[in-house]
Amino acid sequence: MSTENKQSLPAITLAAIGVVYGDIGTSPLYTLRECLSGQFGFGVERDAVFGFLSLIFWLLVFVVSFKYLTFVMRADNAGEGGILTLMSLAGRNTSARMTSVLVILGLIGGSFFYGEVVITPAISVMSAIEGLEIAAPSLDPYIVPLSIVVLTLLFMIQKHGTGMVGKLFAPIMLAWFLVLAVLGARSILNNPEVLQALNPVWAVHFFLEYKAVSFAALGAVVLSITGVEALYADMGHFGKLPIRVAWFSVVLPSLVLNYFGQGALLLKTPEAIKNPFFLLAPDWALIPMLILATLATVIASQAVISGVFSLTRQAVRLGYLSPMRIIHTSEMESGQIYIPVVNWLLYFAVVIVIVSFEHSSNLAAAYGIAVTGTMVLTSILFATAARKNWHWSRILVGLMVVAFLCVDVPLFSANLEKLFSGGWLPLSLGLVMFIIMTTWKSERFRLLRRMHEHGNSLDAMITSLEKSPPVRVPGTAVYMSRALNVIPFALLHNLKHNKVLHERVILLTLRTEDAPYVHNVKRVTLEQLSPTFWRVVASYGWRETPNVEEIFHRCGLEGLSCRMMETSFFMSHESLIIGDKRPWYLRLRGKLFLLLQRNALRAPDQFEIPPNRVIELGTQVEI
């Protein structure tokens, strides 16, 4: 990981604290309150407090420390992580049918993230501002408007990038975790009995004591590990070691101290269940805590927003989402991007969620299904990658996946009970994203197959043109070609209608590799097909944005000199119609594809080609 080489371990570890652990680090704001709020038929009872604390502690140890930090983070693609990366790794050495299944699982996991990302900013910021209920009860009616104002400002600054503000994230989050630890330790010293809950026997006793209702209570316990996927998804930004060091040295101790501190407070003062997090603080510290909590939740929300930008770019580059405008907000960091359409769709969705649910406790019912669903899929995909790619023994992989699923499946099942009380929200959003991604991928493949099914051989056509050339005009023409040995539609139509050809013709194919980055040395491959025809294949990773000017520069280094303002770019523009023979459900999918195609970013804008150098030739295609 290059970042680790450029910066010292303490510096990059501090940066990881500021970004990776925002979501899981703000969970103490609401987790224990939701566990003991009385919704499961029992209130602040000693056995319940000890049971929940034991469950939270061992979930943090098993799921975060053991599963993700020890095992899942081994699965990286050139240092990058995330559910789509894991999907790609798992499908490398499998059959075509198995690969299709793994792709579906990966897309479901990615869709779950889109469902979760709408809830995270809403519940985080609202739970922080709800500290006003303790500090200034008269301001309670303003919690929803204030939450919207804070998030509006956050979404508005996205287009400017977070480079300057981002430098403050790490020290603020470090201060947040230190305050969590101090407040928790202070409360534990007043009631050290609570440390008994470190014994897993209390977790077992909880299930025996509360029987059936204890299973439903797992749906609240899982709030303590929301954001765990960020550890894996952000691996490419910081590297494995800094993320692990940050967890074991700062984050885990702070979280455990704070949860147990809240438990100690509740054992002595059960009425503190109204908001045990803020009631840990002395009266004089309530306003500073409210400000710090709001800043921490804004940072957690920023991490989620950046995550959805990164996932969207990856999905676009892998062909699962339609092309859209991606703006780089930093000349130094390629990972800092802004996608306007995603930003504002997410903003409006978050505002609607805040207005509809009104309180973070109501949102807690919607939280968890997407998180635990992704955990289940991660276990399956990781086990497949371990067996197929690294050839781990069947016994080891079997024991590992059984251990993971013995935790993941009960957590997911418990959260399914929330389906009608809010859980439908992330599932619905995830379903919409899954339909969009599968529609774009499958219909785009169908379109390309229809366009090329009657195509003649490119080599044969070039040979024919060299033997009997049409009228040649001065200059260079570039034709975008999706497949190597297929004649571009724009070239066919130009010959058919204009009956001319430029003196030099370049067939340009853009290829997305199964890697986040492609080294500049391997960026461009040139092949001279004839005295006047050249084939250029430009390779990019899924974290990179293709740029024609850069491609021309690499071509010049290879001996093919091109000047942007002296080159004509010919592109085909498909006018799509839906075939009458398609079943009704495929016709619906076709209409969705037409809508996506109509709103997709045009090729000249994707590749930063000057509009006055582009010639589009239309063709009608039935899909």
Curated annotation (Swiss-Prot):
It catalyses: K(+)(in) + H(+)(in) = K(+)(out) + H(+)(out). It is a multi-pass membrane protein. It comes from the Bacteria. GO terms for molecular function: potassium ion transmembrane transporter activity; symporter activity. It holds the Pfam family K_trans. InterPro entries: K+_transporter, K_trans_C, K_trans_N, Kup. PANTHER family: LOW AFFINITY POTASSIUM TRANSPORT SYSTEM PROTEIN KUP, OSMOTIC STRESS POTASSIUM TRANSPORTER. This is Low affinity potassium transport system protein Kup. It comes from Cronobacter sakazakii (strain ATCC BAA-894).
